Structure formats: C-alpha cells, structure tokens
Regions:
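Small/aliphatic-rich secondary-structure junction motif
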Residues: 1-52, 75
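General small-molecule cofactor/ligand-binding pocket signal
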Residues: 35-37, 80-84, 135
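Structural beta-alpha unit
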Residues: 73-104
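Conserved hydrophobic residues forming the short capping helix/wall of the S-adenosyl-L-methionine
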Residues: 26, 68-72, 96
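Phosphate- and divalent-cation-binding pockets in alpha/beta enzyme and binding domains
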Residues: 17, 91, 113
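A short acidic, glycine-rich active-site loop
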Residues: 53-63
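Gly/Ser-rich helix-loop-strand patches that form or flank binding pockets
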Residues: 95-138
C-alpha cells in the first residue's frame, strides 16, 4: 500500500522520530522505499553560512542527515536523498505531488496555538495540500 514514501526532514529530533515511522511503513512492503527530502530555505541557508563560516555548509547539512541515513540503512530499506531549494512547505508539497508518493511522513515541532497562527506550521501546510496520505509525527 505505501511503497513509495517521502520523508520530509530537517535533521531535528522530530525528524528522527518521523524517520522511525517512515521505516515502519516502508518495512511493511516488499519493495518499500523512502525518499528523504531536505529543503534548503534561502533564509536559513544564509544563517547556516554565517554560523558555519569556517566550514562547508553542504558538509553541515549532510551531518544533520547522518543519523537518519544510518537508521534507514540499518533497516535495509532502499532510499534516496534529495536536497531542494526554497520555502519548505511549498517545496515539499510540490515535490510530493509531482512525484506521486504513496505517503508523506513529516515531523511536527509541536507549536502552540499562537505560534502556529503567527508562524504557520510546515507540517500542517503539507497535510492540507499534498494529494496523498500524510503522517505527522510528534
């Protein structure tokens, strides 16, 4: 049922929990696979470059995904990693809808009601606009 799973991640603890759920879903299928997507937000990318001035920003991003990649490898699930550029919510939605995934798994930061109203929630934006089932992991 869920052969092709998109795992939207930012390398956070919430993403690690989402990874575990994506692995569980993919493991239920003989040919289950996970596509890990990390969106490089222009604003955030600028902050990363300034903060990691002496290091390569690409290496810093890969380190963020290292534990996620190790967990998927350990589970012996086929996977790919894609880096997208833009605003996370719309980019995840666009990628998911264009590539016809069976499910999207994404972590939630657990914003309170006020924060969610002011800032918006990437996970809720994705859930509203993606054309396949979405699992939001707390």
């Amino acid at each position: 049922m869920f052969n092709k799973i998109l795992l939207a991640t930012d390398g956070s603890d919430h993403s690690i929990r989402a990874t575990e759920k994506a692995i569980a879903l993919a493991s239920c299928q003989k040919n289950g696979s996970i596509e890990v997507v990390y969106v490089i937000d222009g604003k955030q990318s600028k902050d990363d470059v300034l903060q990691h001035w002496g290091t390569d920003a690409a290496i810093h991003r890969k380190k963020k995904l290292l534990l996620i990649e190790q967990k998927i490898k350990h589970a012996k699930i086929n996977y790919t990693i894609h880096y997208l550029h833009g605003e996370p919510g719309p980019m995840i939605v666009k990628h998911a809808n264009e590539h016809q995934f069976d499910a999207v798994v994404i972590g939630s930061r657990g914003l309170n009601t006020l924060q969610e109203m002011v800032l918006g929630s990437v996970s809720h934006k994705v859930a509203k606009r993606v054309k396949c089932p979405v699992m939001i992991v707390k």
